UniProtKB/Swiss-Prot annotation:
GO terms for molecular function: uroporphyrinogen decarboxylase activity. GO terms for biological process: heme biosynthetic process; protoporphyrinogen IX biosynthetic process from glutamate. Keywords: Cytoplasm, Decarboxylase, Lyase, Porphyrin biosynthesis. GO terms for cellular component: cytosol. CDD domains: URO-D. The lineage of its organism: Bacteria, Pseudomonadati, Pseudomonadota, Gammaproteobacteria, Lysobacterales. This is Uroporphyrinogen decarboxylase. Belongs to the uroporphyrinogen decarboxylase family. It comes from Xanthomonas campestris pv. campestris (strain ATCC 33913 / DSM 3586 / NCPPB 528 / LMG 568 / P 25). Homodimer. It is found in: Cytoplasm. Pfam families: URO-D (PF01208). PROSITE patterns: UROD_1, UROD_2. SUPFAM superfamilies: UROD/MetE-like.
Length: 354
């Protein structure tokens, strides 16, 4: 039995006593306790692949702040790693793959990993976190989107130009669709396994959807997000596990994402929540969308921006605050002040009371 079900109620667009709040990368390098755990574990992957440490890190922000959800500590690149691409991290450069997929042979060899063998460490972490939370708040599981995962899988790491994957989109679109279809199968299986292990809400991160032109987004990202929303078994009624589709730079597509079958759409700060709510038309809950850079501001500036964000949603939603989950428009950065995060959380709680 959940002691705090605000998040789930808001995602179902049901009344809540105040707007729920959680933050992308709420467990991260801005916390000194996270940095201490990382030093002990030796590396990011040393934390993510150890269920006990993943559980410890997941719970750290909840011990500091009265957040309304925990989100699994993991990485979006666990799926391609389990497919054999071999994930590693370079200090200052981020994630890389030793075996990127760039031709038909490599792409056709890919299969959906077994979730309770190759990715058992993730499922064990979900089970352990649920046990440790003991119903305090819901646990969010997540995956990268097919397009975003394909970007890393083809580029071999992060990219500024996305030259290789865009070249494939123009020169061999059917090959790219084959890859995206395989990755979509894997994402559905991965989220389904997290749900079975105990995740109570699910989020798909389409981090790089915003690098696409509208026509390319509608060909190479949106159909696969829609497939996830429609094919991922989530139960029904009050037992249904809500699905959030989050995208960076997805403001132009809120109406289409709202028609996907997902319960909620997460947006960044490049669209106002008023505009997003009007486009959503009451079909889904919305999550977002404070610019993370607001946390560099003074406490008064943070409170002011939190108030504007809450009011913007209500303005676009016919005066109602229901159906809104407060979050940042993207993840926090390592140099952010934990005290300012506390100011943000307190401001949401105070200013959104019904």
């Amino acid at each position: 039995m959940l002691k705090n079900d605000r998040l789930l109620r808001a995602l179902r667009r049901q009344p809540v006593d105040r707007t729920p709040v959680w933050l992308m990368r709420q467990a991260g390098r801005y916390l000194p306790e996270y940095r201490a755990t990382r030093a002990r574990a030796g590396s990011f992957l040393g934390m993510a692949k150890n269920p006990d440490i993943a559980c410890e890190v997941t719970l750290q922000p909840l011990e500091r702040f009265p957040l309304d959800a925990a989100i699994l500590f993991s990485d979006i690149l666990t799926i391609p790693d389990a497919m054999g691409l071999e994930l590693y991290f370079v200090e200052g450069e981020g994630p890389k793959f030793r075996h990127p997929v760039r031709d038909a042979d490599a792409i056709h060899r890919l299969g959906v990993p077994d979730m309770e063998t190759e990715l058992r460490y993730v499922m064990d972490a979900v089970r352990l976190i649920r046990r440790e939370l003991d119903g305090a708040v819901p646990l969010i599981g997540f995956s990268g989107s097919p397009w975003t995962l394909a970007c890393y899988m083809i580029e071999g790491g992060g990219s500024k130009e996305y030259a290789r994957i865009k070249a494939m989109a123009f020169n061999a679109p059917q090959l790219l669709h084959h890859l995206l279809s395989t990755v979509t199968d894997a994402v559905i299986a991965y989220l389904s396994a997290q749900r079975a292990a105990g995740a109570q809400a699910l989020q798909v991160f389409d981090t790089w959807g915003g690098v696409l032109s509208p026509a390319m987004y509608r060909e190479f990202s949106l159909p696969y997000l829609t497939r996830i929303a429609q094919e991922l078994e989530r139960g029904s009624g009050e037992e249904r596990t809500p699905l959030v589709l989050f995208g960076k730079g997805n403001g132009a597509y809120v109406s289409e994402l709202a028609a996907s079958g997902a319960e909620a759409v997460g947006v960044d700060w490049t669209i106002s929540l008023a505009d997003a709510a009007e486009r959503a038309g009451g079909r889904v809950a919305l999550q977002g969308n404070l610019d993370p850079a607001t946390l560099y501001g003074s406490p008064d500036a943070i409170r002011s921006e939190v108030g504007k964000t809450l009011d913007s949603y209500a303005y676009g939603n016919g005066g109602s605050r229901e159906g809104h989950v407060f979050n940042l428009g993207h993840g926090m950065s390592p140099d952010m002040n934990p005290d300012h995060v506390g100011v943000l959380v307190e401001a949401v709680q105070t200013l959104s009371k019904r």
